[in-house]
C-alpha cells in the first residue's frame, strides 16, 4: 500500500495519484499556491481516491468556493467504500467542518488525531487560526 509524505496509508494504487496528493498536501499545509491543482491531478490519476477529493474540498473551502467544496466532498463520499478506517474518519472530520458542525468537528478531530497522530491534514484543523480554534 502506498503512503503519503507523513507515512499514512493511502487507498490508491497509482504512484502518480499519490505523488500529486503529496504535492497538494504540502502546498495546502504550508499555505502555498498549487494545492487545488495538485489534488485535481491526483483525482485525474485515480478517480476513486477519496482523500484527493477531500484535499480538493478543503482547498476549495479555504478559497471561499463553498459549492465546489460540497461537490468535492460528495465525490469523496461516493468512493469511500473500500477505504481504511483512517480515511473514513478523515471524511467524517471534513464533512462535519464543511457542514458547520464545529463542536462535533472538533471532537472528531481530537479522536482522529489520537488514533492517527501523523495525519497532519486533520491535525491542522485544530492547530490554525484558520481552523477550528480561529
PLM regions with names:
Residues 13-41, 45, 91-101, 107:
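Alpha-helical segment of the N-proximal tetratricopeptide repeat
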Residues 2-19, 77-88:
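TPR-adjacent "capping" and linker segments in tetratricopeptide-repeat scaffold/adaptor proteins
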Residues 106-111, 116-131:
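Asp-box/WD-like beta-propeller blade repeats and closely related beta-sheet repeat scaffolds
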